[in-house]
Amino acid sequence: MAAMASFGALALLLLSGLSCCSAEACLEPQITPSYYTTSDAVISTETVFIVEISLTCKNRVQNMALYADVSGKQFPVTRGQDVGRYQVSWSLEHKSAHAGTYEVRFFDEESYSLLRKAQRNNEDVSIIPPLFTVSVDHRGTWNGPWVSTEVLAAAIGIVIYYLAFSAKSHIQA
């Protein structure tokens, strides 16, 4: 009898574990993306990219684990406090962060595991379809004026001094 009770408890534990941990795929995802990229390279050391999305699925799946792929690099996607809100961020050196469009491919757990497997086996990863893709337009970073303000102020000061000195010399002559 005790063996039967422990078997029943084990079966109940196994079934409850499977029901809580089964990942359901998102059907027909609808996204509302927004993004931010660093535009000023003078005050920052790296260009930062932040993508926020609001995700709703036709089958009402919530709190999915998502992963992002940007140019072959994968990043975990964090869930926001609000249901269906997600965010991913990454940074690049200013030299590497060229102006243009960055394609951010989002994967669920199943497709992400296929992506990682393909990478480990040196297979073509472009055949693995993402759950959805967000295009991030980066306009590049501003590196400051061509001439620093200190040099410009010194040059203007020298020109004013020269004009004042020549006017004084012309008046005294």
From Swiss-Prot:
Residues exposed to the Cytoplasmic side: 166-173
Superkingdom, taxonomy of origin: Eukaryota
Keyword Endoplasmic reticulum recorded: yes
Keywords (A to Z) from UniProt: Disulfide bond, Endoplasmic reticulum, Isopeptide bond, Membrane, Signal, Transmembrane, Transmembrane helix, Ubl conjugation
Residues on Lumenal side: 24-144
Glycyl lysine isopeptide (Lys-Gly) (interchain with G-Cter in ubiquitin) cross-link site: 73
Location in the cell: Endoplasmic reticulum membrane
Any one Gene Ontology cellular component term annotated for this protein: endomembrane system
Main location: endoplasmic reticulum
Membrane topology: Single-pass type I membrane protein
Signal sequence, start to end: 1-23
Residue intervals passing through the bilayer: 145-165
S-S bonds: 26-57
Pfam families: TRAP-delta (PF05404)
Alphabetized PANTHER family for the sequence: TRANSLOCON-ASSOCIATED PROTEIN SUBUNIT DELTA, TRANSLOCON-ASSOCIATED PROTEIN, DELTA SUBUNIT
Family under the similarity heading: Belongs to the TRAP-delta family.
Function summary: TRAP proteins are part of a complex whose function is to bind calcium to the ER membrane and thereby regulate the retention of ER resident proteins.
Assembly and oligomerization: Heterotetramer of TRAP-alpha, TRAP-beta, TRAP-delta and TRAP-gamma.
Protein name, UniProt field: Translocon-associated protein subunit delta
The organism's taxonomic lineage, starting at the top: Eukaryota, Metazoa, Chordata, Craniata, Vertebrata
